[in-house]
Structures are given as C-alpha cells and as structure tokens.
C-alpha cells in the first residue's frame, strides 16, 4: 500500500519519498483544484523534508504554478506538531503550552471560586486540562525527559488546585493520592495500550494496522545507540503493566479482556511506582539525617555556636568583632 495523501475536511497532506515525486503530486493536485474551481493558498501551504538518518538535509524546492512554497522545520496538522527530526520535543512543549493557557483561562471562573467543590474542580481538570496535555499521546514515542516535563506540569496544576504550597513540604506521592490521579507515565502508557488493542482488532487492510505491524522493505538501522521506536515504547508499556509481549495480540482480540488487563496492569504499575518513590524518599531522608548527625560542624570559639559550614562560621565570627 502506497500512501500519497492524507485528507481530513479541508486539510490535505501529500507524501512522497523523493522531491521530484512530490513536485509531480503537487502539480496533479493543483490541476485537479483548477478543474473544480478551487484555489490553493500558497501562504498556508508549507513543505517539510525529513531526510533518513545519516543523509544531509537540503531544503526542498516545491512550486505551485511557478510560486515556490515555504520550507519549514515543523508544522501543525490536526492539532499535532510534526517536526523534521524524529522527535516529540516540540510537540511536548506545545502540549504543555496549550494546557497551561487553558489552565490560566479557568483560574478565575473555576480554580479560585470558593463555591465550587474541590472534587468538581478535579473533574474539570481531568476533562479539560489533562485531555489537552495528553492529546494524541497514544502515538507518541516518549523518552524519560518528556515524561518528566509532563509530570512536573501535572503536579504543579494539582498543587494549585489543592492549595498546597511548597512550604508545606508535601511529597508528590501524597499530592497524587489526595487528588486521586495517576502519574503521567501510567496515563500515557495506558492510552498507548488501549490504542494498540484498538489497532490490533482492525481488519488487515486498514492502514493503521499495516503501519503498526509492517516492516521496512529497505534500509537498516545504524550501528550504536538506536532511536526509540513506537514498538519499543509499546513493549516497555506492556512489561510495566505485566502484559506478555509475545501473546498480547490474542488478549487484545477481546476488547473487554484487553481493557481489564490494562486496568489491572495500571494499578499494579502505579502501586510499584508509588512504593519505589516512597522508598527513595525515605533513603534520601535517612542519608541526610545520618550526614547531619555525623558532621563535625564548625564551633565558634567565642560562644560555642555550631555552624554547618566554614563560611557560616566566618560570617558568625564577624559579629563578635563589632
């Protein structure tokens, strides 16, 4: 199956593997538009070239009726940001920006309103902010840095809703428990697994299923560190949710069984992640307490005051000279 165009409402995206093939598609598309009395807006039409790994980038030159189209590094299609490099860095920043903007617009009418219960505010947050933040996350291939950025924004919003200040010294695990939310990692992996099961149940002729289970006919992966693939992310999610990667397709064939496996796996993964975070926090606290207990300190010879650092002792000695 060769995919040449992606159509949705009045949006159209053309795909080609070579520059001359793309120019041919654009010429054919422009001719078809003329036959139906349509006009292509060259100011809204952009070109993006994604070279294969190891191949130098060159700016494409695509024209419509003699007018060259603007080449861009990234563009937005159906709400998602597509970049020239195979990374979701810009998409994650875009998601955080849109969710932050939505959170700010609701501050006066929802978050700061005393007449609205906290439970209702959390439902609004889940329906508006969280869906904006994780829009199209089913198709992401996230790295840990992306999940950390999303999780930090998630916790900032929950602390603001629950009126928890940083001076209260309440850990993130307790904030999530009070709000009744899971971590961003669990939410993203849960969405990916649900989407994977939906694709697995599609007929074999459907394009999403062919893309998920297909293999490249040409080319090979470079030597050394490899870029993370969607299949790699999906396999990690299955292992985290205690789902066998070898037999997941049989489980996903039955929708109710697959949903139950995902829900149970999410609870297990969240409990393990919570226990690990609590254990790390206790270890960090114990190391700090033991270091403070065994530290010799710096004693003032004048009054016997103990200072934690030498610079503190020097500053304190100045008070005796005045």
Range-by-range predicted roles:
Residues 1-322:
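Short linear motifs embedded in intrinsically disordered, charge-biased segments
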């Amino acid at each position: 199956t060769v995919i040449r165009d992606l159509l949705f409402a009045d949006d159209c995206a053309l795909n080609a593997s070579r520059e001359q093939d793309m120019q041919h598609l654009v010429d054919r598309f422009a001719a078809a538009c003329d036959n139906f009395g349509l006009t292509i807006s060259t100011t809204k039409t952009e070109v993006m070239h994604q070279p294969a790994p190891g191949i130098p980038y060159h700016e494409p030159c695509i024209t419509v009726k003699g007018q060259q189209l603007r080449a861009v590094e990234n563009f937005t299609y159906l709400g998602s940001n597509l970049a020239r490099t195979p990374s979701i860095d810009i998409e994650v920043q875009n998601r955080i920006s849109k969710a932050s903007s939505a959170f700010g617009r609701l501050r006066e009418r929802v978050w700061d309103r005393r007449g609205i219960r906290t439970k209702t505010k959390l439902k609004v947050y889940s329906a508006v902010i969280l869906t904006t933040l994780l829009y199209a996350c089913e198709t992401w291939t996230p790295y840990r840095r992306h999940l950390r950025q999303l999780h930090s924004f998630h916790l900032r919003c929950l602390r603001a809703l629950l009126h928890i200040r940083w001076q209260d010294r309440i850990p993130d695990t307790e904030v999530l428990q009070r709000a009744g939310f899971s971590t961003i990692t669990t939410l993203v992996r849960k969405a990916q697994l649900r989407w994977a099961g939906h694709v697995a149940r599609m007929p074999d002729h459907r394009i999403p299923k062919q893309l998920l289970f297909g293999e490249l006919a040409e080319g090979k992966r470079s030597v050394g560190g490899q870029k993370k693939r969607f299949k790699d992310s999906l396999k990690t999610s299955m292992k985290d949710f205690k789902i066998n990667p070898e037999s997941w397709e049989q489980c996903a064939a039955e929708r109710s069984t697959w949903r139950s496996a995902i829900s149970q796996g999410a609870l297990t993964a969240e409990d393990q992640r919570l226990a690990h975070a609590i254990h790390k926090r206790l270890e960090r606290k114990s190391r700090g307490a033991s270091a403070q207990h065994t530290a010799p300190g710096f004693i003032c010879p004048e009054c016997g005051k103990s200072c934690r650092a030498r610079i503190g002792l020097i500053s304190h000695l100045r008070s005796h000279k005045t």
